């Protein structure tokens, strides 16, 4: 049976209702699904997706798990284990790059959110290199998105506990500047200039500087890039390690630091660094990688392609990599018979300004693909997550309503054209917009999501994990489930 898989990013279950955008939204399609379509509850966090116990899930991990049909131990766990077992100091890429210079620059997101980085990794590398007699400069990127919006001072105190004679903080940038992924080079340039060139110097201590930004109403995500302590910038032949393990928001800043042919903005000077990256950020990057990606065979898309069936993958810009690269097990190029359609995300500063985003155009692409008879259609609706990240409850309610409207069209189209339909989420977000004290929550939730299965002759969907989605799709399509995959939900 031809099948549609809808991933409603950031829409999850919570029994708390007061600040629950899903609960408060007018959602006739979901009301219909709850009454008429079997569903199970799906785990999206912690060990169920290869993350540490209790760690919130995220879009990268979720889509890898959905598409591979198995639990892959994620980079966060792999790196943490290498630190725990004292193996990272002998990592070939780390040794290769850091032995080139007595000076090592470490750059990464300063939080324990575990989505892009972990402060434990940054601290461990700094301590190892310091013990080896290296002069270590820290370039800290403040978070405020995967963790509380004003939590940087806590993480600063933690990292300052390891700062000593040869470990010091050289720069601080909010992730809005240093971790863009949409080619907003004016932002990236500001971060680059503080990190590489020591521009925008301040005489304040890092703690005083962050507090001064708070006093101006500027919180962690948006801290203006600065340099500290007389840091004059990097010099040729120094070593640089970027410690984030998630690729999408690391590419741009690393590209402008390391690419001699970089042309997106005019660099005052190009510093020739010895660069290593924690994971593979881009297949075209020439830098040594501490933790190269694990090769994942027999993913959902690969199995469908191997049976010479046509498949269609679509999402907005913000989640396009998730329904292509991540869903396909970390593979850049499309499989034979796989078509990809990118719908541009709206060009707004934050998505609460346009909570519907471009959902209607994404819905149009799905309807068209169904009418064209694709054997498998997968789509991601970004609204619940991207608007959930803004912390704006009213906007998040509108985001859910926009997704619900498109789901209604897809349900109708699936029924009309005799498609099986799965609707699930990679993780939650918008169902908890504030905590009990009314503090804004911008992070993903630690909880379950629904998986609805509208399949001819199927009246029960079991509870399970994201790893059970791909085998369920293959079963609905009457295709063999490869031995690497886990069991289906029906």
UniProtKB/Swiss-Prot annotation:
Cofactor notes: Binds 2 manganese ions per subunit.
Pathway(s) served: Carbohydrate degradation; glycolysis; pyruvate from D-glyceraldehyde 3-phosphate: step 3/5
Family per similarity comment: Belongs to the BPG-independent phosphoglycerate mutase family.
Protein name: 2,3-bisphosphoglycerate-independent phosphoglycerate mutase
GO biological process entries: glucose catabolic process; glycolytic process
Gene that encodes the chain: gpmI
Enzyme class at the top of the EC tree: isomerase
Entries under CDD domains matching the protein: iPGM (cd16010)
InterPro entries the record matches: Alkaline_phosphatase_core_sf, BPG-indep_PGM_N, Metalloenzyme, PGAM_B_sf, Pgm_bpd_ind
Active site feature: 59 (phosphoserine intermediate)
Residues engaged in binding substrate: 116, 145-146, 175, 181, 246-249, 319
Gene Ontology cellular-component terms listed: cytosol
Subunit annotation: Monomer.
Sequence positions that bind Mn(2+) 2: 9, 59, 426-427
HAMAP family, per the entry: GpmI
Molecular function GO terms recorded: manganese ion binding; phosphoglycerate mutase activity
Function, in words: Catalyzes the interconversion of 2-phosphoglycerate and 3-phosphoglycerate.
Binding site for Mn(2+) 1: 385, 389, 444
Cofactor(s) of this protein: Mn(2+)
């Amino acid at each position: 049976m031809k099948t549609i898989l809808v991933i409603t990013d950031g829409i999850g279950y919570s029994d708390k209702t007061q600040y629950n955008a899903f609960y408060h939204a007018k959602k006739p399609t979901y009301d219909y699904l709850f009454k008429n379509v079997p569903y199970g509850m799906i785990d999206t966090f912690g060990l169920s997706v290869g993350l540490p116990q209790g760690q919130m899930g995220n879009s990268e991990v979720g889509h890898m798990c959905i598409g591979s049909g198995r639990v892959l131990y994620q980079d966060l766990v792999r790196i943490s284990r290498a630190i725990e077992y004292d193996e990272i100091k002998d990592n070939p890429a780390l040794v290769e790059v850091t032995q080139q210079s007595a000076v090592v620059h470490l750059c990464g997101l300063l939080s324990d959110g575990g989505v892009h980085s972990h402060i434990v990794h940054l601290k461990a590398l700094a301590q190892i290199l310091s013990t080896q007699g290296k002069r270590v400069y820290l370039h800290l990127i403040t978070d405020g998105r995967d963790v509380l919006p004003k939590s940087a001072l806590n993480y600063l105190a933690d990292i300052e506990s390891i700062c000593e004679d040869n470990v010091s903080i050289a720069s601080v940038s909010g992730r809005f500047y240093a971790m863009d992924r949409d080619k907003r080079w004016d932002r990236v340039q500001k971060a680059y200039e503080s990190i590489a060139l020591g521009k925008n110097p301040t005489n304040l201590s890092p703690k005083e500087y962050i507090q001064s930004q708070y006093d101006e109403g500027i919180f962690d995500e948006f801290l203006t890039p600065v340099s500290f302590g007389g840091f004059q910038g990097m010099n040729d032949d120094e070593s640089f390690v970027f410690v984030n393990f998630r690729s999408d928001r690391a590419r741009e800043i690393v590209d402008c630091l390391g690419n001699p042919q970089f042309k997106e903005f005019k660099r005052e000077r190009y510093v020739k660094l010895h660069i290593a990256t924690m994971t593979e950020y881009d297949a075209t990057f020439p830098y040594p990688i501490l933790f190269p990606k694990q090769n994942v065979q027999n993913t959902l898309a690969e199995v469908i392609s191997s049976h010479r069936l046509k498949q269609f993958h679509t999402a907005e810009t913000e989640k396009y990599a998730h329904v292509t690269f991540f869903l396909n097990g970390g593979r850049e190029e499309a499989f034979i018979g796989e078509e990809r359609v990118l719908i541009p995300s709206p060009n707004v500063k934050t998505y609460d300004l346009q909570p519907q985003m471009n959902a209607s155009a994404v819905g149009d692409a799905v309807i068209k693909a169904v009418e064209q008879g694709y054997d498998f259609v997968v789509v991601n609706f970004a609204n619940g997550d991207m608007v959930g990240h803004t912390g704006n409850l009213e906007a998040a309610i509108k985001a859910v309503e926009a997704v619900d409207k498109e789901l209604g069209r897809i349900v109708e189209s699936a029924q009309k054209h005799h498609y099986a339909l799965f609707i699930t989420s990679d993780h939650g977000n918008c169902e908890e917009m504030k905590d009990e004290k009314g503090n804004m929550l911008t992070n993903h939730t630690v909880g379950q999501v629904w998986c609805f299965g509208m399949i001819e002759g199927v009246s029960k969907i079991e509870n399970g994990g994201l790893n059970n989605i791909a085998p369920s799709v293959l079963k609905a399509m009457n295709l063999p489930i490869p031995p690497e995959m886990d069991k289906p939900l029906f």
